């Protein structure tokens, strides 16, 4: 042991694993089955240890080595030596030697932890967690590097691809309307995939310098990744906390992904989850890989922390709804329905309604592993050639349809169909009862060029190209509108799953299913049409008033179908909130400007389209006033409003024309007005 350091007396306490600041020094705890263990102290650039302190065998508790060392640790770094082999601390809170992303020059170099960081105090300035319930959440899934790494991000160069870059985009997130940011693994891991030789003549070699861009690998689960810190990567701890504080200040939540491969001790996983909740004020953790979900799900320290996992079988939920299911079931089934597969109606109604009272549900139409939303409507097959594995990696089950051409297309018909299918997908997502999740960039047509497994693509394939905000502005506007629409109407995000019953005795069930005829739902395997009626008396608007009535008509058949419309109470009329077939209005109508259906008993829903009707109360007009207005304004309105045409119906814009039968009789079956 070097002069200036001495082993202090133990006080009999049980210390947390890793490093803990104590009076006059530091306490070190390390778990190992080895026969001997030593603490090695270094100066930052030192190659030889400044001090080697052997853990006294008498202070060993089971397989946990403990020692309190007194002295000045300023500017020093540490590792452990077990049976003569040097190893980093798995409980380390920050690491040096990994600051430069993808640098092959650091291979074989030392990876050490600063000692002093364990005792630093951060000023949270009264930070509080928003604690947004699942039914009010809209999750936005990002990669901490790829979100702002592209030059088009508008973030200054030094902050691109960093935690600070994420914080700089908070105004954009607020404008979009999301409430919660989910971040792919932000912990320290080695992104360099070591080259490997082929095991057989038919398997490709993994080339030198390949990077693990996603971060789903074993890492150091207590340290934020230094390469995601600005400048030279010296302050990842402070920058991550600054980002969290900035998000909370604007009412946004942060959920992080932690990956475990199942080889970790359950106590290590539990310690990591508790640490991020306490030390970094994260609002939730998405457990990826293999984690002891029962241990975490029933832990009292985590009972108010959002915990996301593929399933929670066998876990006893607490009083607060903090657990949530997170898997691909919604995505795969809804994509199948979207592209017109048969026998999907039962799955549609299940996912639209699914929202258990004690466990949340996370829904998405696209996520990390698979096609983006734009690629889902642009490619029939994966195109992973850039991964260097002969296109063998990644799933072959994408449930996608390219709308008539593989990859980019300039054909107007194909582009219109793709936009419509994206609008359909977004309505399916945001009108379902579970918590919607949007993958970064899907709100403005991000593409990964058909790559559905971009785990190693640290380039334009994975980085978010913000210039698409301009070229695909219609998708962006639609997403903002549908998020706002969902927030304003609680019938689409109830606290518990709809009962399909009139349990309040208001004359209608909370939610009911309909076929082409009202109150006659049909679920035959060959059908692709369904109507869903929402009774507004079971929901509240943000101002506390009763919600509106809604009728959502789904037609994923490649032919149009006429839907009978449910009757509304007296003085209520149906208004068109969304019609995904109407490309000229981007499939939506502004709040307060929804066209009204006058005395209309049915509506033709075009092929592969979704129509959302809103039942609102309309003040009755006196006949004289109506006649006077009609006489003076008839000609002016005919000239002012465009005509909207479909294969089976012809109607004019607000306050014009009638619905004409496709039979050619010209019979007026109802006027469409605003």
What are these regions (language model features)?
Residues 1-23, 49-51, 59-143, 148-154:
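The feature marks proteins involved in alpha-glucan
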Residues 25-35, 514-566:
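Carbohydrate-binding surface patches
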Residues 30, 80, 142, 173, ...:
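Conserved, mostly hydrophobic/aromatic
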Residues 32, 74-76, 593-628, 670:
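C-terminal beta-strand-rich structural cap/linker in extracellular carbohydrate-active enzymes
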Residues 105-108, 112, 281, 293-445, ...:
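Conserved alpha/beta catalytic core and glycan-binding cleft of carbohydrate-active enzymes
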Residues 153-162, 193-249, 253, 260-279, ...:
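Aromatic- and acidic-residue-enriched carbohydrate-binding clefts of CAZyme catalytic domains
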Residues 174-210, 370, 378-382:
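Carboxylate/His-rich catalytic cores and anion/metal-binding grooves
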Residues 482, 559-594:
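C-terminal accessory region downstream of the catalytic core in glycan-modifying enzymes
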């Amino acid at each position: 042991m070097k002069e200036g350091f001495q082993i202090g007396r133990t006080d009999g306490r049980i210390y947390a694993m890793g490093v803990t600041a104590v009076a006059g020094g530091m306490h070190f705890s390390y778990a190992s089955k080895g026969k001997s263990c030593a603490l090695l102290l270094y100066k930052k650039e030192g190659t030889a240890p400044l001090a080697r302190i052997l853990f006294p065998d008498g202070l060993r508790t089971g397989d946990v080595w403990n020692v309190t060392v007194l002295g000045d640790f300023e500017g020093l770094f540490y590792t452990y030596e077990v049976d003569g082999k040097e190893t980093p601390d798995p409980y380390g809170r920050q690491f040096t030697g990994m600051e430069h992303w993808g640098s092959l020059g650091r291979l074989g170099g030392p990876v050490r932890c600063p000692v002093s960081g364990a005792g630093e105090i951060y000023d949270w300035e009264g930070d509080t967690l928003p604690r947004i319930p699942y039914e009010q959440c809209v999750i936005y899934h990002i990669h901490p590097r790829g979100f702002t790494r592209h030059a088009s991000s508008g973030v200054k160069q030094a902050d691109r691809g960093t935690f600070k870059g994420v914080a700089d985009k908070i105004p954009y997130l607020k404008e979009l309307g999301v409430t919660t940011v989910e971040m792919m693994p932000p912990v320290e891991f080695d992104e360099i995939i070591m080259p490997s030789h082929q095991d057989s003549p038919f398997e490709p070699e993994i080339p030198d310098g390949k990077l693990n861009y996603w971060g789903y690998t074993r890492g150091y689960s207590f340290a934020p990744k230094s390469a995601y810190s600005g400048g030279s990567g010296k302050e990842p701890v402070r920058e991550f906390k600054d980002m969290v504080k900035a998000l909370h200040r604007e009412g946004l939540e942060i959920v992080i992904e932690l990956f475990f491969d199942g080889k970790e001790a359950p106590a290590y996983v539990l310690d990591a989850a508790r640490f991020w909740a306490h030390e970094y004020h994260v609002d939730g953790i998405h457990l990826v890989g293999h984690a002891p979900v029962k241990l975490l799900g029933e832990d009292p320290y985590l009972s108010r922390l959002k915990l996301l996992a593929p399933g929670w079988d066998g876990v006893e939920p607490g009083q607060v709804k903090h657990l949530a299911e997170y898997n691909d079931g919604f995505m795969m089934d809804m994509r199948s329905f979207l592209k017109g597969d048969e026998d999907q109606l039962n799955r549609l109604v299940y996912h639209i309604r699914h929202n258990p009272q004690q466990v949340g549900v996370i829904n998405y139409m696209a996520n990390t592993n698979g096609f983006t939303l734009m690629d889902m409507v642009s490619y029939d097959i994966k195109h992973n050639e850039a991964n260097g594995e002969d296109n063998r990696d990644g799933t072959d089950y994408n449930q996608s349809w390219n709308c008539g051409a593989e990859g980019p297309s300039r054909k107007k018909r194909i582009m219109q169909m793709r936009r419509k299918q994206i609008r359909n997908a977004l309505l399916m997502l945001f009108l379902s009862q579970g918590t919607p999740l949007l993958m970064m960039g899907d709100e403005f047509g991000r593409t990964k060029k058909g790559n559905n497994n971009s785990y190693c693509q640290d380039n334009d394939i994975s980085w978010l190209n913000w210039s698409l905000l301009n070229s695909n502005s219609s998708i962006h506007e639609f997403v903002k509108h549908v998020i706002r629409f969902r927030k304003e109407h609680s019938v689409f995000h109830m606290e518990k799953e709809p009962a399909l019953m009139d349990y309040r005795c208001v004359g209608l069930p909370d939610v009911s299913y309909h076929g082409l005829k009202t109150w006659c739902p049909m679920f035959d395997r060959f059908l692709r049409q369904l109507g869903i009626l929402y009774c507004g008396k079971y929901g509240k608007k943000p101002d506390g008033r009763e919600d509106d009535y809604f009728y959502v008509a789904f037609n994923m058949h490649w032919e149009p179908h006429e839907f009978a419309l449910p009757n509304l109470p007296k003085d209520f009329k149906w208004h068109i909130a969304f019609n995904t077939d109407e490309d000229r209005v981007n499939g939506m109508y502004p709040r307060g400007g929804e066209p009204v259906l006058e005395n209309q008993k049915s509506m033709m829903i075009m092929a592969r389209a979704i129509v959302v009707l809103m039942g609102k109360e309309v003040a009755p007009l006196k006949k004289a006033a109506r006649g006077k207005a009609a006489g003076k304004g008839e000609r002016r309105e005919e000239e002012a409003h465009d005509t909207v045409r479909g294969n089976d119906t012809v109607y004019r814009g607000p306050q014009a024309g009638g619905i004409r039968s496709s039979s050619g009789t010209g019979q007026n079956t109802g006027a469409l007005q605003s």
